[in-house]
């Protein structure tokens, strides 16, 4: 969930596709459910046999070294576009938010360098803790920006959706004539994304380092994190009718556009005050 897609692709889908973007909430809430059954078994076998990769697990299960090699190659090829997408997204964010003071390429290299350093020095557990801090930070940023842009551009959620319905009623529907997505495609997007969710090689690697109990707890709690994506989608909806289509090269640029054109000093102060602990406010 917590990736550059959340801040670029998520708002972009809401801005350009409307209600079709809600499939993201569905697959994030349901994607890990199969791991409730699979995960604990993977964890136990991984600790017992000292597995490191997904290929180790499958190769041992089917007694095939050839399968280990194939899984390794497929995993590597699958990670290349995934990692490239993340690094490109960070490079773009650095470039836009620094008003070209950091170039696209330098921003991507900076993001890659930070990741390489903390993974190389801290290992798997260090990467896991970085995920925790990243999630907390992104939750805060997402809710602050989501609430701010809705209130500053429309006054309230009700006003925002009323304006969208008034200008384009089918934009908030699924499967109707004129809507951005058919019911079949919407459903298939959810199913395919759910299946893909539990096929990532790093899901196996992380399961080897934890316990069956923690895996089950994580699976049960994980749907709550879909709440994080609500304000992300609100950002995209808030931009409808505000950001001209020809102002963007592609829909994924909508959040950087809003930040650079509609985030004022008062908006930054609003974000800070929103998250000051209440005891300090009381004093």
Which residue ranges define each predicted feature?
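Membrane-embedded transport cores of multi-pass solute transporters
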Residues: 132-133, 139-140, 272, 276
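Membrane-interface helix-loop-helix modules in multi-pass membrane proteins
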Residues: 1-50, 181, 185-199, 203-247, ...
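Helix-loop-helix module between adjacent transmembrane segments
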Residues: 22-119, 188-193, 205, 276-283
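Helix-boundary and loop/linker segments of multi-pass membrane transporters
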Residues: 59-64, 174-180, 259-265
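Hydrophobic alpha-helical segments and their helix-loop junctions in multi-pass secondary transporters
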Residues: 40, 79-87, 91-106, 110, ...
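Small-residue-rich segments of transmembrane alpha-helices in multi-pass membrane proteins
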Residues: 59-64, 134-148, 223-227
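Membrane-helix interface residues
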Residues: 18, 62, 121-122, 131
């Amino acid at each position: 969930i917590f990736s550059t897609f959340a801040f670029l692709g998520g708002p972009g889908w809401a801005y350009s596709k409307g209600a079709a973007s809600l499939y993201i909430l569905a697959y994030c809430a349901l994607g890990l459910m199969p791991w409730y059954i699979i995960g604990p078994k993977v964890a136990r076998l991984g600790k017992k046999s000292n597995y490191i990769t997904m290929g180790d697990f499958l190769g041992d299960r089917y007694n095939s070294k050839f399968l280990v090699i194939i899984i390794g190659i497929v995993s590597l090829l699958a990670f290349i576009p995934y990692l490239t997408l993340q690094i490109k997204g960070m490079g773009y964010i650095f470039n836009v938010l620094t008003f070209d003071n950091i170039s696209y390429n330098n921003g991507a290299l900076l993001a890659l360098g930070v990741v390489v350093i903390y993974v190389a020095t801290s290992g798997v557990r260090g990467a896991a803790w970085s995920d925790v801090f990243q999630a907390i930070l992104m939750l805060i940023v997402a809710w602050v920006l989501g609430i701010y842009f809705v209130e500053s551009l429309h006054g309230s959620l009700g006003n925002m959706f009323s304006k969208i319905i008034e200008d384009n009623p089918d934009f908030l529907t699924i499967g109707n004539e004129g809507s951005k997505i058919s019911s079949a495609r919407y459903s298939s997007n959810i199913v395919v994304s759910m299946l893909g969710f539990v096929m990532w090689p790093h899901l196996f690697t992380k399961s080897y380092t934890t316990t069956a109990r923690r895996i089950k707890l994580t699976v049960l709690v994980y749907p709550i994190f879909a709440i994080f994506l609500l304000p992300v989608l609100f950002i995209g909806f808030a931009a409808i009718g505000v950001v001209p289509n020809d102002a963007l090269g592609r829909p994924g640029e909508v959040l950087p556009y809003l930040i650079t054109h509609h985030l004022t000093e008062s908006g930054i102060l609003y974000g800070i005050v929103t998250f000051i602990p209440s005891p300090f406010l009381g004093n």
